[in-house]
Structure formats: C-alpha cells, structure tokens
A protein has these predicted regions:
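Active-site pocket-lining segments that scaffold enzyme catalytic pockets across diverse folds
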Residues: 194-196
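Extended amphipathic, helix-rich lipid-handling scaffolds
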Residues: 1-21, 25-71, 94-186, 199-201, ...
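Short consensus segments that form the blades of beta-propeller domains
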Residues: 189-191
C-alpha cells in the first residue's frame, strides 16, 4: 500500500522469529493499493474500511475480512464478510526455488476455499483487472459483464483457479444480469444470458442444479430465436445439468434439463413440465 491516509491499528503474532498472523482495523481514504508480485498499476480506492487478517497454517494461507467496505469511483461496495484460504503447491514452490533461487515466499497455489456473505459482482468485475485473479477468470468476467448481488457464497477448488481439477460452488444471487454470447458458428446455439434474475445454484465439475426466476426480466438465447431476448413479466424454471469430460483437447459434453417451467408476458403464459 504505497499511499493512503486515515487510521490503522494492527496486531502481529510472531513465533520463532516468523510472522504467523496479522490483523488490522482500517479506516483509510485515498488509498493506492498494490498486490504483492504484481506489476500492474496500483488500485486507487477512495475509501477502505473494516477489519482484515492474514494467517499461515502449514500449507494454507488464510485471508479474512469483517465489515469490509470499499469505495472507488462509481463503485460503492457495502460492508461484507469473506474468507479465503489458498493452499500452497509445495512441488511447484520447490521447483521454482530450485530454478531461480527464489525465496519460500514465491509460491504457486494448488486449490482453496472462498466464502462470502455478500458480494457485489458488478463491482468485483470492475475491480478484477487489478485483483490477483487468473487471466482466464478475468477474461470470463469481461465476457459475462455481470451485475447483481451474490449472497451466501461458498466455493472450493482443487488445482489452479484457471483450470481446477475439481470444484464445488453454492450461492444465491439477486438482480443478476449476465451477457449472452453468440456462437462462432451461426448454426449453433450461443451461451445464454439474462437480466434481472434471481438464482439459487449448486454446481461442481460433474454438473449441478439451479432454480432461476425472472421478475420483469428476460432470458437471452443467441441462435434459438430470431430475436434472442424474450421479455417476461414472470418466469421460473428448475435446471439441472451433467458434464461429461471428453478426450484431451475436446470440449466436454453438457446435458441440460429444465423442469417446472412457468412463464407469463404480454403475449402468452403457460407452463412446461420438462424440456
């Protein structure tokens, strides 16, 4: 943090000459925040307030925030609580140290967990360019252009965040909007999107389930209809999907089922038991 003004109170736990944990209460203004090991421009924040902590336990590095609020330009992130645990990849760290003489602090990561009671994903997407996220995650956020609020998020992954070997995700979202993406082949369906949605989701590398509802919103289906966006006064459906991995280099096969679908708009209303 090369720049900032305000108040900071910190507690540091040291054992056998090593820092084991750090906890700080922050009430800062006009902050320039830079993440370790990153060469990108510092992240400017008008306000940063709350309690943050970091601790190491064996291979696991834990970060936590309580009542953390952030303001930057048009972004006003309300006070929230989150926890992040990232597991060191000992093999990668040893190889890097042997190859370059880097210290033990130069670590790659091999999995972790993340929980949060509330996240403004539009603000997160805007800040993503300066956050320590993988490039694939950043690119996906740019493509999705998400907005809305996510509550009770719990995620776990094994392997690199860009390409995890396995993962689980559970969350609820409201006022959610995600951009659709047409397929490169005009004869194929693109990636669907929606606006003003409520979503309850559980997912893993093998598949998942979700309950989707729209109130004065619209799903977007590129390649399915002449006009891809279909506005609804109300819409609800239960989704389930299975993911079947293919041979190396081939995209996985995804089978999606929709049940208990109900819809109503100015032109029609009805329900479908299964699709």
């Amino acid at each position: 943090m090369p720049q900032g003004e305000g108040a900071l109170r910190a507690w540091i736990d040291v054992a056998a000459g090593e820092v084991k944990s750090v906890q700080a209460d922050l009430a800062l203004r006009q902050v320039q925040l830079r993440f370790p090991g990153r060469t990108a421009q510092a992240l400017p924040l008008e306000r940063l307030q709350g309690r943050v902590s970091a601790a190491r336990d064996g291979r696991t590095l834990r970060f936590a925030a309580e009542r953390l609020a952030v303001a930057s330009g048009s972004i006003n992130w309300p006070a929230s609580r989150w926890n992040l645990a990232r597991h060191d990849d000992d093999r990668a760290a040893a190889a890097a140290a042997a190859a370059s003489g880097a210290s033990a602090a130069t670590l790659s990561f091999d999995g972790g967990e993340f929980t949060a009671d509330r996240l403004d994903i539009g603000a997160l997407a805007t800040l993503a360019a300066q956050l320590p996220l993988g490039e694939a995650v950043k690119q996906l956020l740019i493509e999705l252009a998400p907005s809305g609020q996510v509550n009770n998020l719990a995620a776990r992954w094994d392997g690199p965040l860009d390409s995890p070997r396995s993962y689980t995700l559970k969350a609820q979202a409201s006022a959610l909007a995600i951009a659709a993406k047409p397929a490169a082949d005009a004869n194929r369906l693109g990636r669907p999107g929606w606006r003003n949605a409520t979503l309850d989701i559980e997912a893993s590398e093998n598949g998942g389930r979700a309950q989707l509802a729209l109130n004065k919103g619209a799903p977007v289906f590129p390649g399915l209809f002449e006009r891809p966006e279909v506005a609804f006064d109300s819409f609800g459906t239960k989704l389930s999907w299975r993911i079947a991995p293919q041979t190396t280099g081939a995209l996985p096969v995804i089978e999606v089922t929709a049940t208990d679908t109900q819809f109503a708009n100015a032109d029609a209303h009805g329900q479908l038991a299964k699709a």
